[in-house]
Amino acid sequence: MASLFKKKTVDDVIKEQNRELRGTQRAIIRDRAALEKQEKQLELEIKKMAKIGNKEACRVLAKQLVHLRKQKTRTFAVSSKVTSMSTQTKVMNSQMKMAGAMSTTAKTMQAVNKKMDPQKTLQTMQNFQKENMKMEMTEEMINDTLDDIFDGSDDEEESQDIVNQVLDEIGIEISGKMAKAPSAARSLPSASTSKATISDEEIERQLKALGVD
């Protein structure tokens, strides 16, 4: 019983209108078919009266045929109007649905805007940016400290490499001679004296090889 008193929605009203329009269209088509049938009968009657020479009957039947054809033409006009109304109803239904969707979207946006505090959102973004900058600065400081720690040993190794390269360029293989030098464990002259002697001899040998007395 509750469904009987339920308020009709827009869709329900449009569906009823479409059903009525379709019923009207079918009725118009039936009427046109009946008129076409009468038209053929009148044409046959006119031909029959013409054969027997009954001019008066031909004239009366011809007037009836003219009126009938006018009525048939009207059915086409009405049918076209009904089709137009059906199309217009569908367009209106589509527009109303779009309007409903837009209304729902507007309400959703309004609710979101009420929940969202622009000032609070801006503050949150600023805090994020500030903390991100702190993190980047901390990371940079840690990297600089690590570079300072490891760069010291690298500098020492690099300095030793430069010294060896210079000695190699003037023909002194100090590393090789150092390997052949007597160790401090043996009862021989001190390491500093051996190094100096080896270095002098090596220099003299290199000079002689170059042809310098």
Swiss-Prot record:
Keyword field contains Hydrolase: no
Cellular component GO terms, alphabetical: amphisome membrane; autophagosome membrane; cytosol; ESCRT III complex; glutamatergic synapse; kinetochore; kinetochore microtubule; lysosomal membrane
Coiled coil: 25-55
Pfam families: Snf7 (PF03357)
Keywords on record: Acetylation, Coiled coil, Cytoplasm, Endosome, Membrane, Phosphoprotein, Protein transport, Transport
MF terms in GO: protein domain specific binding
Biased composition (Low complexity): 179-194
UniProt record similarity statement: Belongs to the SNF7 family.
Name of protein: Charged multivesicular body protein 2b
Organism expressing this protein natively: Mus musculus
